[in-house]
Every structure is written in structure tokens, then in C-alpha cells.
Amino acid sequence: MGIHGLAKLIADVAPAAIKEHDIKSYFGRKVAVDASMCIYQFLIAVRQDGNMLQNEDGETTSHLMGMFYRTIRMIEHGIKPVYVFDGKPPQMKSGELAKRSERRAEAEKLLEAAEEAGEVENIEKFNKRLVKVTKQHNEECKKLLTLMGVPYVDAPCEAEATCAALVKAGKVYAAATEDMDALTFGTPVLLRHLTASEAKKLPIQEFHLNRVMQDMGVSHEQFVDLCILLGSDYCETIRGIGPKRAIDLIRQHKSIEEIVDNIDLKKYPIPENWLHKEARQLFLEPEVVDTESTELKWIEPDEEGLVAFMCAEKQFSEDRIRNGAKKLAKNRQGSTQGRLDDFFKVTGSISSTKRKEVESKGSAKKKAKTAGTPAGKFKRGK
């Protein structure tokens, strides 16, 4: 689920923290991608006649097709992806997982009724609700990535937390996931829609955590408490406190404990056995990989290995797989060139007030020298 309503709240309260870019803007960038989120997207979206793709043996192949072609697309644009797979879910997530099981059981009943009534649209809708990423899906995608020469990381716990840790350690530029809790886990940069279908034509949304906190007027600990109030996978929320009220209360009282001491508990009852402290600890000190010992290597694809796995075993078209392997090999060279801004380090900065003063003085001098001729326009590279 991530954090309920966080993206909209940021758009409303801290819109300057969100930038929109085309995929071409990420040439030379290393990005940690939430693998489970991607695989789930592929199982939902990569379909034929409303059903997941299958080979002649009845094995699902939607995840492999999605992983193969979306990864090639990123590499063709000079992006170096590293996929991060979920480990064991934290104990605190058991309540959320139980709710998901209940929703699946309900969807199964509704699917059965839709099939009996011959309701095609509802059959497709409820089939999608039953989609679940399995261990086999994960293992097959890991095998595929290895053959493609793309690194992956097995997170000890939540993938988003390890993605965030890799960004904080400087191993990658950003965490790519649809789950907003990557920000709560502390990723400095979050990318949404990076692995979305090209047909959707969605711009990539880039969220900057420091700007979010600056414009909201909160510290990271206060931001975590705000996310807990909005609703996460790890504990319940206080009923009646929506996003607007939550941020107002955090700004006023600074922590959940202070909020609880100052609100009308009859109007806003606290959940029984509320685990907000444990949720806070999980966000602030999650179980993640040792980033220092984590080596990320992008190597040449194994074309023959890809053909053996994807064609002989999974029954994909050999021409298409070989063509994809050649694209990987060709574009791997391009993505190793890196970005210009990797070679230049900013040694200092000036405040926005000072910058405006400098710019206004500079423009005044320029006008005097050029006798008011229009200045040329330029775009500063990123």
C-alpha cells in the first residue's frame, strides 16, 4: 500500500518537491528498482485477451516478458538498473497481509459469481485482484536478470528500505517504485512511473525528500510520524484525522505523543494496542543490506544463455530474444559513459536570497553594458 494519500499531499503542500521528466533525462543514472512492484505490474498489465501470458505448458510468462523488455528500454536510454527483491516481511506487516488475504478470498467469490454470469469485464477485474507475486516469479526474474548482465540485490526485509539505503550510500541516484514509503524510509530521491508501460505516456515523477520536508516545515522524524498518521502497512491510524489535519497537527505538536496529549480522545479515539512507536522505529532504522559490501556490476549479456532459458525453456521467439540481447550489448557501452555531472562536484552554494541579489546585480551591469539589448536565453544542464 505504501503511505495513503502521501503523493497527493506533497502535490498540494510541497509541489516544488516534485519534478516531471522524460526517461531520456536519466541517461547515465544508476537506479535501484523495486523488483516485486515491477513484477506485480507486469502480471497485471502484460496480458492477452484479459489473461496472463502463458507458454504451451501453461506456465505464466507475463513477468518474464515485462522484465525483459522494460529492462531493455531502460538500458537503451542509458539507465543502469539494479533490481531489489523483497526479503521476509516484517512481523508488523502481518495485520496488513491478513487484510490482503481477506480481500483475495472476497475477490475469489466475486470472480466465481462473475464467471457464472458470464460478465467479461468483472471476470478480468477480479482476476487482476487475485494476482500475487510468487517465489517462482522472483527466482525466474533473477535468472533472467543474471543472463541479461543486470545486477540484483536480495533485501533482508522490505525492498523499498534497501532501495533507500543504496541511494543514501551513493551507490545509485534514486529509488524507483510506486510505493511512497520509500520516502518514509529516507530515500533522498524517489522515481515513480519509471517502469510504467510506454503506451501510458506517463512522465516520470521525481520526488526530492529534502525539499518535501523543507516545504512542509518538518524534520525527518516528524515526516515519519506524519506518514504513520496518513496510514502505512505497519499500524492503524487515528480515525477522523485526514491528511490536512495530520500535517497541521504535526506542525503544531511535532510528534504523535504530543498530538495524543492534546487532542480530544473522544472525537479521535486512539487504536487499541497502537504500534506507532514500533512503526516509527521500523521506518527510521529498517533492516537493510550492508551497502558498503554491496557491489553492483553490469556485465555483457549471455545471448546463448538467454536463448536457452527464454526460448527452449519458456518458448519465447528466438528472433526477438536474440534481437533484445544485441540491444543490451550495444547499449551497455553507451550507458558506461556516465553523465557529465558525475565529473564535476559542487564545492559550495549560496542561499536563494543571495542568489537573487547576485543575479539582479549581474543583470543590472549587463543591461548597462549592452544598452538594454535583450539577453540571450540558455538552459542549464542537469
Swiss-Prot record:
GO terms under biological process: base-excision repair; DNA replication, removal of RNA primer
PTM description: Phosphorylated. Phosphorylation upon DNA damage induces relocalization to the nuclear plasma.
Chain segments carrying region N-domain: 1-104
Co-factor requirement: Mg(2+)
Binding site for Mg(2+) 1: 34, 86, 158, 160
Enzyme Commission identifier(s): 3.1.-.-
Note on cofactor: Binds 2 magnesium ions per subunit. They probably participate in the reaction catalyzed by the enzyme. May bind an additional third magnesium ion after substrate binding.
SUPFAM superfamilies: 5' to 3' exonuclease, C-terminal subdomain, PIN domain-like
SMART domains: 53EXOc, HhH2, XPGI, XPGN
Pfam families documented for this protein: XPG_I (PF00867), XPG_N (PF00752)
Alphabetically ordered keywords of this record: DNA damage, DNA repair, DNA replication, Endonuclease, Exonuclease, Hydrolase, Magnesium, Metal-binding, Mitochondrion, Nuclease, Nucleus, Phosphoprotein
Location, primary (coarse class): nucleus
Localization per record: Nucleus, Nucleolus; Nucleus, Nucleoplasm; Mitochondrion
Location of region: I-domain: 122-253
One Gene Ontology molecular-function label: magnesium ion binding
Enzyme class: hydrolase
InterPro entries to which the protein is assigned, alphabetical: 5-3_exonuclease (IPR002421), 5-3_exonuclease_C_sf (IPR036279), Flap_endonuc (IPR023426), HhH2 (IPR008918), PIN-like_dom_sf (IPR029060), XPG-I_dom (IPR006086), XPG/Rad2 (IPR006084), XPG_CS (IPR019974)
Keyword DNA damage tagged: yes
Entry binding sites for Mg(2+) 2: 179, 181, 233
Assembly description: Interacts with PCNA. Three molecules of fen1 bind to one PCNA trimer with each molecule binding to one PCNA monomer. PCNA stimulates the nuclease activity without altering cleavage specificity.
HAMAP family referenced in this protein's UniProt entry, alphabetically: Fen (MF_00614)
Function: Structure-specific nuclease with 5'-flap endonuclease and 5'-3' exonuclease activities involved in DNA replication and repair. During DNA replication, cleaves the 5'-overhanging flap structure that is generated by displacement synthesis when DNA polymerase encounters the 5'-end of a downstream Okazaki fragment. It enters the flap from the 5'-end and then tracks to cleave the flap base, leaving a nick for ligation. Also involved in the long patch base excision repair (LP-BER) pathway, by cleaving within the apurinic/apyrimidinic (AP) site-terminated flap.
Family in the record: Belongs to the XPG/RAD2 endonuclease family. FEN1 subfamily.
Protein name: Flap endonuclease 1
